Amino acid sequence: MKPILTALSLAVTLHAAPVKLFEEAPVSVTEPAPGIVLVDFGKVAFGNIEITPPAGAKGDFTVHFGEAFADGRINRKPPGTVRYSFASGKWEAGQVMVIAPPVDARNTQQGDGKTPPAILTPKEWGVITPFRWVEIEGWPGDTKPASFVRRSAFSADWENNASHFESSDETLNRIWELCKYSIKATTFAGVYVDGDRERIPYEADAYLNQLSHYATDDDILFARDSFDYLIKYGTWPTEWAPHLVFMVKADWMRTGDAKWLAPRYEKLKQRILMERVGSDGLVTSNAAQIKKGDIVDWPHTERDGFKFTKANSVVNAFHLKAIADMAELASALGKTDEAKAYRERYAKTGAVFQKTFFNESTGLYRDGVGTDHSAIHSNFFPLAFGLVPTDKRAGVLAFLKKSGMKCSVYAAQYLMEAMFDHGSEREALALMTADGDRSWKHMVNSGTTITWEAWDQKYKPNQDWNHAWGAAPANLLSTYVLGARPAVPGWKTATISPRTGDLAFAKGKVPTPRGPIRIDWKNGSGFVLDLMLPEGMGAKVDVPAAEGSKVVFVNGAKAEAKLLDGRWILMNELSGKVRIEVK
């Protein structure tokens, strides 16, 4: 795609990553009623349709596009902003016809001074919409699948085989496939947008999208272009701004590219909420910011009764995480004094955070100053961000396990991180695959092919059915169950730390800038990990300690390893192709 819009004055030119139209054949073509053809493409994608009518075709037609299906037909009155549209015209015999839906006013608006402009797709494509099914009224002849081709917009460089995940839990495998495809399908705009309703980038959406894109395909352009757009067009929630710091930190860890970081570093200082810091170092909130700004979670019904106050634990947890990341980024650029200042601020404000928000009587973090209420968010955000002291973690974890999924699909990214990072992978995986309507199992069982904006329609009646912020398992299963993450910027050294839960096995392929990591582990009476690292990459490895295990072997030879907190920590860095056995 070309640069986004035209007259934007930025130090960094705005671009969109390359996207193109791919031709896709239907999986089935049927006639549900006389004169009606129903075309099913198997999955939802953003696009339009190319139709080749038979020779001699004439008369009128109506083409219906739909995301939802009901009673064997496209649902023409879907809930909320689930997509349905139609286009009518006259057949042109012997001509290949591109049929596109009408323009949607909201997701093509170009700004009113209050709302960022929607991302426009190329005019030469015609209008695109998310759809799986097409119904054609007035089809003038025999139905042949070759007559119908969906023109679907995806990343031009997407590589389907770049990543893989498979485990002993078939539901988990289906969740992975749903989330991976969700990342692919939502690349249609060249930057990360929040779904079809608005087609606008938001910082939190973009960061979650970035993590899952990294886990499913080796691409950095989408995240970088989304970041540059959001620096120009920031959005309203308080906690969304620090997500831009998270995005740059994630890019730095993936690429080690200081040249990209350097011209963006100063802009990040405007995203860490320093303008709202009081004399004690905490971020404060006025009445307007409490009413609209401090978001905690979205939709608002997902906040677990959170009590908003003049200084709250969630906003301050985000502030501290951003400060910690800024210290690392400053060091990466050789800004030694700034890095030191950030570290000192983090230590000082972190102590105030503990004193202000930790409730010694309950062992939990309170929502804010002046309340003893403890929402789940006030506890998993600090835990995920490394703010909870070691001696306080057990109580916080117990609370999280008891509470369950009392947060949105957005915040679930951080709830899962908090649990996986602190030895509760069994419970994290159980939440992913739980019965009921607040899990990814519910999404896959619903038949959706792209993740939703919310757990269910009843939790957000106007939700999109094409929202990549609901695809967190794409990165969580790669990072934690397979266990691969960068140990140093640029992946010169990886950390391999598989979290097994109750799974008997898992295997997969993790894309990195240095080439794919292949992981295959089995967890039974012992633990076996087959690992293949790309050339030029080393790995620090730790593995589960099977009950009663006493020794670790690497390629058949006894390895130096230390037993710590139920895991064997290998003392020497590994490279190439290795087999690790715990006995």
Where would I find each of the regions flagged by the language model?
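C-terminal capping/lid segments that line or modulate ligand- or cofactor-binding pockets
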Residues: E198, L244-V245, V283-T284, T301-K310, ...
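Non-catalytic C-terminal accessory modules of carbohydrate-active enzymes
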Residues: K20-F22, G72, E344, A351, ...
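Positively charged n-region of N-terminal signal peptides that target proteins for export
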Residues: M1-P3
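Extracellular/oxidizing-compartment recognition motifs
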Residues: A17-G190, D205, D219-A223, K259, ...
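Well-ordered alpha-helical scaffold segments within catalytic/enzyme domains
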Residues: W139, L208-D217, L244-W260, F318-T336, ...
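Hydrophobic h-region of N-terminal signal peptides that target proteins for export
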Residues: L5-A16
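Active-site acid/base region of carbohydrate-active enzymes
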Residues: W133, T143-L221, D225, T235, ...
